[in-house]
Amino acid sequence: MKRPARRRGGLSKDHSSGGEWSSGMLYKSTRNSGCKVTSAAAITQGISADGGLFVPESLPALSPADMTRLAGLGYADRAYDVFSRFLTDFTPEEIRHCVDSAYNDRNFESDRIAELVHLYDGTYMLELWHGPTCAFKDMALQILPHLLMASAKRTVPGKEIVILVATSGDTGKAALEGFKDVPGTRILVFYPEDGVSPMQKRQMTTQDGANVAVCAIKGNFDDAQTGVKRIFTDSALAARLADADMLFSSANSINWGRLAPQIVYYISTYAELVKNGEVRQGDPINVVVPTGNFGNILAAYYAKHMGVPIAKLICASNANNVLTDFIRTGVYDRNRSFYTTVSPSMDILISSNLERLLYALCGEDDARIADWFGSLSKTGRYEVTDDVKAKLAAEFYGGFCDDDQTKAAIRAMFDKYSYLCDTHTAVAVKVYEDYRRETGDTTKTVIVSTASPYKFGASVLEAIGGSVSGDEYEMLDTLNSRSGLPVPEALAGLKTKPVRFAQSVEKQQMQDVVLHLLGL
């Protein structure tokens, strides 16, 4: 394939049509640019053997004409178009099957899949939680099993795929729901014992399916994520799996098959704004994303560099504000206090997907990536170069808020606009208020809403002045009576489901749990 011209930030853009399949799109490791694989191999492997993350060799371009055409399509057809650009080794029929199996009215309560709500003054809420587990992770994890099985069939036929997941709450349940009873797969989810909401824990520990397992660890999400990465890159363990015709893969956002579907909803959102006459094609928008592992906002960055006219990427953090500090100073330092907050899915100090962004911003210099992330592993910190700092500041704004400010934002949204949001969305609301006050920027803005408020019922109820008493199900009923927002059946039905998984282990025992589960 002819290599496209470089774009700013180190990313290159490929101007081939999304409707044509070619042999062009390969994926390379952020730590070894010479390691190149097909999209099917990248999705099956999850992570490169050198510990790097797979990124596309180039980004497919969306022209203004493409965006105008996408505005006339529904969500599934927009997804088909985007995937056809990234997954060039898949057939059109395979992509259509994956898309139609994921984005339908059996899995999502809205036929629009993602709901775009106009709040006030050119500010919109993108609700990504109308899927089966009431969190934005469904947007990717309803399609990932189909992408993975199609990939495995092509790259490792006959192998059983073992999915390992570290979760701070939402990914675990969404992955379990997506992979339950999928032939040829097993899935094991690790979560921090005291680092998820009661509703998130209940969702995971009651999960049905013959091929699923869930285990708590005594530690935080970073411990779980580090443990899973260590297991993935253990060559001796990989050899044992190979002897048993098994192969590890990931459902975390380190897997490109998780990230690509997230790019879709940013492209679709802009197309929807154009379709509804809220913006004219080419008008800029800002995007505000509450994030801990950086995957959700990275997807917006990729959409921007494909051609979606996103002006500012606003990164919203809770008290674990390592990303805020990094965007403002260029210093990433996880040597700090870890806080358990009311927005637990963002209680993260090691943001894995930042590696992909830095690979783009440093001109795809894999040696620099290896140096920075080697330093992070050894010392817990690194500092990027001045050129990368400048690019960060040009594209991103970082802000954070504490729990009291989060609850105040929930209350203000409810009182002013009769809009009930969850704790993570409230972090984004508060950070956007700070950004707008600080900059005076009135560009139309989309705030990403990542979870149903009922997933964090106690905190939301307390925020709007309700009485926090009884169990979580009584609080759901109280929240429903106060807000009028229907309780999702997926959450209300948990009350009568039996707990299947109650195991809790030290973080050092994670590999033992995996070996026991697999009978190795």
How would you name each of these model-derived features?
Residues R3-R6, K13-H15, E20-L520:
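PLP-dependent amino-acid enzyme catalytic core
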